[in-house]
């Protein structure tokens, strides 16, 4: 599929997500990466997602993180990349085979609280072992599946740095992460798969925030990432990654 067609498809998804309440105001951003290219396309800053078109996307160099000219499509004059562009860049730099990133601000993702902090910027959150996990290719019976929740640093680059370091060192169980009190970033090999993963993720978070018994009090149990993922003990941020059963606002 041509770049033009892919950006038109992302524009359609932006309108759909805006209608669903996943991209309220001008929140969120969408991106694609063409295999073997040195950059990626991402929606510009401050745009209403129900009004996107192919010229509302900038081409960003993967290494520098800066917008560069593209021979394919000329972006709208004066368009600037969102600060959250660095989140998309982190995923593309850390994981092979990713061709689409979707960053949205769903209500349910903002309700989940893991008590992250600057000193404990990532915790692992256990997902319920329900049927929809098969959308991610997880077919085991009663699997133990965890998603990283990242502290919502004021500087988005700090969020991106945490995410990239985590993804590079540990194979993620699922194709998404949660940024606490902020939103979710979901990815896939292309827009079709990424959208499917986003729909599954939204269902899971709705399920969790609707299930009252998922609300716990008291101290969470803590495990290191290596304990959870069954790898050699390694600490990424020189602190343990706690696993929270779940708490909601």
Curated annotation (Swiss-Prot):
Family matches, as SUPFAM superfamilies: AraD/HMP-PK domain-like
EC number: 4.2.1.109
Keyword set, alphabetical order: Amino-acid biosynthesis, Lyase, Metal-binding, Methionine biosynthesis, Zinc
UniProt pathway: Amino-acid biosynthesis; L-methionine biosynthesis via salvage pathway; L-methionine from S-methyl-5-thio-alpha-D-ribose 1-phosphate: step 2/6
Gene Ontology molecular function terms on file: methylthioribulose 1-phosphate dehydratase activity; zinc ion binding
Record-linked InterPro entries: Aldolase_II/adducin_N, Aldolase_II/adducin_N_sf, MethylthioRu-1-P_deHdtase_MtnB
One GO term describing the cellular component: cytoplasm
One family name in Pfam for this protein: Aldolase_II
Cofactor dependency: Zn(2+)
Positions bound to Zn(2+): 103, 105
Cofactor remark from the record: Binds 1 zinc ion per subunit.
Biological processes, Gene Ontology terms: L-methionine salvage from methylthioadenosine
Reactions the enzyme catalyzes: 5-(methylsulfanyl)-D-ribulose 1-phosphate = 5-methylsulfanyl-2,3-dioxopentyl phosphate + H2O
Similarity comment: Belongs to the aldolase class II family. MtnB subfamily.
Record function comment: Catalyzes the dehydration of methylthioribulose-1-phosphate (MTRu-1-P) into 2,3-diketo-5-methylthiopentyl-1-phosphate (DK-MTP-1-P).
Protein name per UniProt: Methylthioribulose-1-phosphate dehydratase
Native source organism of the sequence: Leptospira interrogans serogroup Icterohaemorrhagiae serovar Lai (strain 56601)
